[in-house]
Structure formats: structure tokens, C-alpha cells
Amino acid sequence: MAALSGGGGSSSGGGGGGGGGGGGGDGGGGAEQGQALFNGDMEPEAGAGAAASSAADPAIPEEVWNIKQMIKLTQEHIEALLDKFGGEHNPPSIYLEAYEEYTSKLDALQQREQQLLESLVFQTPTDASRNNPKSPQKPIVRVFLPNKQRTVVPARCGVTVRDSLKKALMMRGLIPECCAVYRIQDGEKKPIGWDTDISWLTGEELHVEVLENVPLTTHNFVRKTFFTLAFCDFCRKLLFQGFRCQTCGYKFHQRCSTEVPLMCVNYDQLDLLFVSKFFEHHPVPQEEASFPETALPSGSSSAPPSDSTGPQILTSPSPSKSIPIPQPFRPADEDHRNQFGQRDRSSSAPNVHINTIEPVNIDDLIRDQGFRGDGGSTTGLSATPPASLPGSLTNVKALQKSPGPQRERKSSSSSSSEDRSRMKTLGRRDSSDDWEIPDGQITVGQRIGSGSFGTVYKGKWHGDVAVKMLNVTAPTPQQLQAFKNEVGVLRKTRHVNILLFMGYSTKPQLAIVTQWCEGSSLYHHLHIIETKFEMIKLIDIARQTAQGMDYLHAKSIIHRDLKSNNIFLHEDLTVKIGDFGLATVKSRWSGSHQFEQLSGSILWMAPEVIRMQDKNPYSFQSDVYAFGIVLYELMTGQLPYSNINNRDQIIFMVGRGYLSPDLSKVRSNCPKAMKRLMAECLKKKRDERPLFPQILASIELLARSLPKIHRSASEPSLNRAGFQTEDFSLYACASPKTPIQAGGYGGFPVH
């Protein structure tokens, strides 16, 4: 640091000695004054000091640039050290000394850089500048944008180029990630980083250009009347008559046309480009792919011990990073409207979690979310029962219990007393205790599979059933009560696309009994026997899955482990969402307190669930992300991230938001609307994902819009109309082209 400062000071001092004769005429004195000014050790004195300061000022921007390069070089040294020794829990002491030396040097360089920036921005004019006044340089930067557009942004200290140009780019339908920024220096364009401080570029001109590989086109708008459920992509309000881009699917009202992005960006290919560029320039070593300790909850096997030296270095508060990433990680704004309990995750024991605390109004969620789809059908056309329609859950219960207005007209005291007595009787019959199956009534058969929290058997109880024995040998009273509370909600689930809950048992151990499904799982069909489904069948499977999840969410039930292993197909391809687990028995308990830890099927986990930074990461939108992965399996026939064999690397990249499924692998005959829906469900930010009522409406609209092959009207089939073979003898109606025997008609002689 001393050598660096001394060198810089000599350069400035030399300039002072050569340029200011009134300062004493001694080049050495000018050098001393320049060095003092550069190091910030003393204030310049009158006379020679003023001349040296005046001569050194023009060199400050150049010194700032040099310091910036030194900072970059120091950071590279730190990253190289971390690449070499960062994965070791007890690195050598010489490595720690070198690490501390580089970080101290980096802090000093950054502090000196800040001092120079302040002197550059808040510089006061000297006597020479008063004698020769110049127009003050405005702290602005001129920027040339794509499509021959330009703008001017203020050069504020501490603000990056990205933040300064973000608004201007968004108004033109662009994002910084799809553009590159250049500065003009010596007549040449030199690229600069988006995280560069804008104050370093005061008075310069920047050029923003779209990257070559970014699919950027102009919109192709058409007027459209949306007869099904659709929302404006700008104001998020209901859309009936408006416009839609045929390329990117952007929908809007006529009054919102001024807010439409000017450019049409294919974000699917853009995400793929970012991921490929990231892996190309920033490979993640295997020893560094484990998730940082601060992002993993306590108790996770992936987190190193807190008293080791390695994690302290990896999570050091210094500006350097252990792994080079494009920008610092910022967790998405989490939605705290739904307060649900939590539990451990398992790759083979899925879970449906029940919110027994407070019902959730899906209308409010839909209103806040909006949806970027092609629109969809009204939920009235859905085969979903009324309980799955969007709306307040209290209203749904009222609809289920009141068949019509006639019951409301019963106001006599006798009828109301009878109703109350009937309700009490039904309440006693429908209690949770009546759903408990006594010990000895279930005949347990062959073992089907096992997971971290239970084992599934095929059993007999008034027919074939699936019995899931839970790994809880001696439940505490708190666990047993929570288990019964959740069973009280599960017993009310009745839907064609949900495995039927039939009961539970507590002796000899906790177990739940569900309907037995004769078919195989969707995972078995797609990845084991590789069944080749037609596209219309795949879309129907997606529709039924969305319909079942829509019903669960309307019941305030979060699945929390939706994946292709838990979706079963009957022989007639009827979808059954199953493997109901319970959050109570899948959590780590200490007395009456419940704790969480990261485990489960990582391929289907949303980024916010992987991070586990919030007390409550599970929500309706986390199920939507898992459904997006299921859609990816349906449309590609393979699992995501099949090219990455390191589980920790997948956890790190998905949790940080740098890895998403490659949508370019979908089948060629996959509809564009389905691909857009898949991209919406796989949004990295939770609040940007749609909800299942909108997803179901879009899939139903897509299914109705697919071309269907009908029987030709020119080739009728009498069998299809209900005729039997005996009926043909009753009607001697010959075809017009059939030769007619002359014996039937006397007008033709017979020769």
C-alpha cells in the first residue's frame, strides 16, 4: 500500500513541479506536496501547495481508475486463495495470514478510492480557477440507448450504473441482463461492468447495446376479445377486450397501451443464455458447491461446524466473495400472509400440510398476483367441485352446507330445533375419533416402499388400501393432538383427483390409510418405462393435476412435496394426487416445540424453500413451483438439471437463483401457451408465480383450443347411430351408385 501510494504521489508531484513555476520552481518540492495530497496526510499550504493541488487535480480520475484496477486485482488474489483453501475446515496458517493481508489491503484501497471520489465531486475552485473561470461540469452522464434513443442520468456517488439506468431500460422493455454497457475512451468502446460507480464516469458518454444472442424483436399486436379468464399484464385487472402480442403473449387494455414495453423479449431463451454464460465463466468447484452456512438452517448436514475456521472465512464480512457471482444475492420479498407450520422434508415421504390456524382468502391472493398467461376459462366450466372455486373459504363452506335458498326460509322454532339436533348428531358421527381404525382390523400385506418418515404397505380393510406406517414410536401428547387436528382436515377431502383418505390408526403405531391405486406413478411412466404419451394426453394429465391442487388449496391445504412420484395414474389415465403425509410427524420435536431442517426432493423445491431463511417458506406458490417442474417432466420426458451430478451444486445454484430448468428441451409440438405457463410457474420470485385457479383456467383454455379430429361427415356409420345388423334387412335403401336389378322395376325389359 505504501509503495502504491508513494508511486502515485511521485507522479502527481512530478506534474506539479513541471507545470507550476510559481510554486517554488523545485520539482522535488512539488513531488513532496503531491505525495502528501495523494496520501491525505496533510492539507496543502499556500503558494507551492496551492499550485501542486491545482496541478494534481486533473490526475485524480486517472488515479481513481488505477485504484479500481488494483482493487480488482486484490479481489482476484482473495478469490484465488479461497479457490485453493476455502473448502478446508482447517487451512494452513500462512493462508490465513495472506488472507488477512489481502483483505486489509483491499479495505485501505477502497477507503482511499472513496476519499478521491469525494475530492473529485466536492472539489472547490482554486485561485487559478477564479482568475480563469470555467463553466462548472454538471454531474451527469449521457447515455445512448438501443433504437437510436438517448437519455441523461445524474452521476451520484455510491450509485451503480445498473441502478442509474434500470428505470430508463424498463421503460423501453429492456433489462440490464440482456444488454452491455460501454464507455468511449480514446475513440474506442471499452466495456464496463454494470456494478461500476456512476460517479466515476461523470461527464462521459455511455453506449448501451443489446447482446448479440438475446432474442429481441418488435411486438406483433392483435386485437383480441377474451371470452375466458384473462388479466392485463400491466394493471393486473380483468381483461375482456384488449390487445395481445402474438410473440411474447403480453396482454393489455387499450388505456394501458402507453405503458407497454417497446421491445419484445423472449425471456425463456434469455434465462438459458444467462445460465450458460454463468457456467462458462464461473465454474463452481465441487468443494465450494455446498450452500453457505448462513443460508442453511441449523441441524442441516450440509452446514459445517460453526467453530471451524473455514466457514468463518467463507462468510467473512469483507467485500470479497468465496464464489464469483454476477451480483450479490438478495433474497426475494417473502409473503407472510399465510402462516403455516413447518416440518422436515423427505425425498420419498411427501407431505400435505394443513393450515389449521387461519383460512386464506384466495381472491385476495389472485388480486395481488395477476397472471401472465393466455387467459383461461372461467372456473364455472371446470369439473372442480364448488369448494375448489376461487373465493373466501368461509363462503365455500356455506355453499357446501346450504343446497338452496329454501333452507333459509325455514324460520319456525320447531324446524330450527330439529336442525340443531340433527347437526349435533352429525357432528358426533363425523368426529375424528370415528375415523380411527381399531387395532387388528387392518391386514398389512407386502411392503411397497419406504422413506425417511414412514413405510407404505398394501393392506386389506374392506378392500385394498394403502397403509403408511409413520416412524413415530412414542408420540408425545402434543404430537398426538396435532396429528388428530390435521386428520380432522384430511378426512373432509373428497375429490376425483385426490387419493381418498379412509382413516388412521394409533396402535401399534401411527398410520394413515388411503385409497389403493392400481396404476403406476407418473415418475414410473416418464422415467422408468418411458411411456410415450400423446401431447393431448400430457395436457390432460397436467389439467387434472392442477385441478386436484386447486381443490387442496381451496381447502387451505399445502402439499409441500408435490412431485411426479406422488402423482398416480389409473389405467384410464385418471390422475390421483397422493402420498398424504402430515407435518406433525415429519418435524423434529423438542418437548412441545417444533423445528425445521432442510431435506426432501430438491428438484421440485422452490428457491425460497431451499434457502430456508424465513420461518415459513412454504406457501401456495411453492406448490406452484413444484407443479412447474412436473410440467417440465411432462413436456420434456426427463428430469431437470440432468447434466449436473452434484446435489450440493444444484442446491446452491437454485437457491441463489442462478439455475433454472432448460426450457429449450421441451418437445417440438409443445404449445407456446404451455411453455409460457411453465415459465410463469418457475419464476424465481415467489410473488411473480400464478395461483392454481388461474393455472387451471389457462390449461382448460389450451385443451379446448387444440385441434380435434372428427369423423368425416361424408362417411357415415350406422352402427354409431345405434343400428344393429338385423336392421339393415328392414330397409332396402340402395346406394345411388349401386346397380339396381331390373326385376324390382317393371319399366325395364329383361333380355
Curated annotation (Swiss-Prot):
Biased composition (Basic and acidic residues): 331-346, 406-432
Post-translational note: Phosphorylation at Ser-348 by SGK1 inhibits its activity. Dephosphorylation of Ser-348 by the SHOC2-MRAS-PP1c (SMP) complex consisting of SHOC2, GTP-bound M-Ras/MRAS and the catalytic subunit of protein phosphatase 1 (PPP1CA, PPP1CB or PPP1CC); this relieves inactivation and stimulates kinase activity. Methylation by PRMT5 decreases stability and kinase activity.
Modified positions (Omega-N-methylarginine) in chain numbering: 656
Amino-acid positions noted as binding ATP in the UniProt annotation, renumbered to this chain: 448-456, 468
Subcellular location: Nucleus; Cytoplasm; Cell membrane
Cofactor: Zn(2+)
Sequence ranges of Low complexity compositional bias: 46-55, 297-324
Active-site feature positions: 561 (proton acceptor)
Modified residues (Phosphothreonine): 356, 379, 384, 738
Region annotated Disordered, chain positions: 1-55, 288-440
Details of cofactor binding: Binds 2 Zn(2+) ions per subunit.
Membrane as UniProt keyword: yes
Ranges where the RBD domain occurs: 139-211
Catalytic activity: L-seryl-[protein] + ATP = O-phospho-L-seryl-[protein] + ADP + H(+); L-threonyl-[protein] + ATP = O-phospho-L-threonyl-[protein] + ADP + H(+)
PANTHER family in the record: SERINE/THREONINE-PROTEIN KINASE TNNI3K-RELATED, SERINE_THREONINE-PROTEIN KINASE B-RAF
Oligomer and partners: Monomer. Homodimer. Heterodimerizes with RAF1, and the heterodimer possesses a highly increased kinase activity compared to the respective homodimers or monomers. Heterodimerization is mitogen-regulated and enhanced by 14-3-3 proteins. MAPK1/ERK2 activation can induce a negative feedback that promotes the dissociation of the heterodimer by phosphorylating BRAF at Thr-738. Heterodimerizes (via N-terminus) with KSR1 (via N-terminus) or KSR2 (via N-terminus) in a MAP2K1-dependent manner. Interacts with MAP2K1 and MAP2K2. Found in a complex with at least BRAF, HRAS, MAP2K1, MAPK3 and RGS14.
Protein family: Belongs to the protein kinase superfamily. TKL Ser/Thr protein kinase family. RAF subfamily.
Protein purpose: Involved in the transduction of mitogenic signals from the cell membrane to the nucleus. Phosphorylates MAP2K1, and thereby activates the MAP kinase signal transduction pathway. Phosphorylates PFKFB2. May play a role in the postsynaptic responses of hippocampal neurons.
Protein's name in the database: Serine/threonine-protein kinase B-raf
Species for this entry: Mus musculus
